[in-house]
Amino acid sequence: MNNLSRRSFVSFTLASTSLLAMPAISTGSVRPKVVVVGGGAGGATAARYIAKDSKGAIDVTLIEASKHYYTCFYSNLYLGGFRDYDSIGHSYDNLSANHGVNVVHDWAISVDSSAREVRLGSGATVSYDRLVLSPGIDIKYDSIDGYSVEAQTKMPHAWKSGTQVKVLRDQVLNMPKGGTFAMVPPPNPYRCPPGPYERISMVAHILKEKNPTAKIVVIDPKNKFSKQGLFMAGWEKHYPGMIEWLDPDTHGGCLLYTSPSPRD
């Protein structure tokens, strides 16, 4: 299979939308419309390059509820104190000002493929000729009994960047001396398999400097994890005695329940 480059993808998109909207284009009155749902790395990049490489021939609208996007990549560097918070945040102003993308800050509620419309949380609709869906992931709060949107402010999952990573950093820095940091990584499959263990490593880095008698307990529902040998060798070398990884055979299985009290 031949690789599809960004430029050939945009050329294909331009050609296909032109065919779809041929009567409008032939009169010179209406540009074909591409709507992108989701302003993360994937959606924002798609919106930018469709607008840029079409040289304005395509009317591009990006629908994203948040006014700032905080990257998961580099968030560990913020967590460990190697970058400041603002450095992982990005606004959408550049897309509008430099690339002519229409940015709509609202929730996309539903898609009517027959009418070619996206319905927004406000009740308005946005029409399209071609639709790009890049909503990213979200947390299934009800998958853990007792967990909720409200609970995440006290027991951060930090699986999404931004405020969640900020809460996590503040809590780690304010742990009592000799306290215990506990993590329950998710079962497979999930996005970025090494992610929880990268977080553990950075938390250990903070504690080694700020709270060296603290302990980290990893209660894992898996018998093994991504890059396990490398992580455990690194933990033993840099944080000896601080991190305890428990597999199901050791801890007997995870009871998926959280107490309203964040430290019970």
Question: Model regions: which residues?
Answer:
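A glycine-rich helix N-cap at a beta->alpha junction
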Residues: G234-P248
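Conserved small/polar residues in nucleotide/adenosyl-binding loops
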Residues: Y257-D264
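Beta1-alpha1 glycine-rich phosphate/pyrophosphate-binding loop at the start
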Residues: T27-N102, P187-G229
